[in-house]
């Protein structure tokens, strides 16, 4: 995909995945990579920002002698996801109108 993906779309994708199950960072990056070209060095700042905004929380769980940090969506995160979905629908509708030549004023 050659289109630049906005931070809001990446945040929404992360939050949407976390509505299904909790993920640790690497697994979450792997899931997002299935759709968007993203590196761990891009993902972790997004996760920190989402946590700072209280849109997700974290907990540690032992795995093979090490701790994995898992991310979990919060109620505020669900609200933010709904806002992102609404913004996306508005953008999609406007973009579709332009691309299909239906942008009447």
Residue ranges of predicted features:
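N-terminal helix-turn-helix DNA-binding core of bacterial DNA-binding proteins
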Residues: 2-44
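Short, hydrophobic-biased segments on the C-terminal half of alpha helices
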Residues: 47-49
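Amphipathic alpha-helical dimerization/coiled-coil segments
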Residues: 82-105
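Beta-hairpin "wing" of winged helix-turn-helix
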Residues: 53-67, 72
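Residues that scaffold the ATP/ADP-binding catalytic core of kinase and kinase-like folds
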Residues: 17, 80-81
């Amino acid at each position: 995909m050659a289109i630049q993906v906005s931070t809001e779309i990446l945040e929404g994708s992360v939050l949407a995945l976390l509505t299904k199950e909790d993920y640790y960072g690497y697994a979450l990056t792997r899931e997002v990579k299935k759709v968007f070209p993203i590196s761990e060095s891009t993902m972790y700042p997004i996760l920190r920002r989402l946590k700072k905004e209280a849109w997700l929380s974290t907990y540690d769980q032992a795995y093979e002698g090490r701790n994995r940090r898992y991310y979990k969506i919060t109620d505020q995160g669900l609200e933010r996801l709904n806002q992102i979905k609404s913004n996306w629908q508005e953008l999609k509708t406007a973009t579709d109108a332009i691309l299909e030549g239906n942008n009447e004023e």
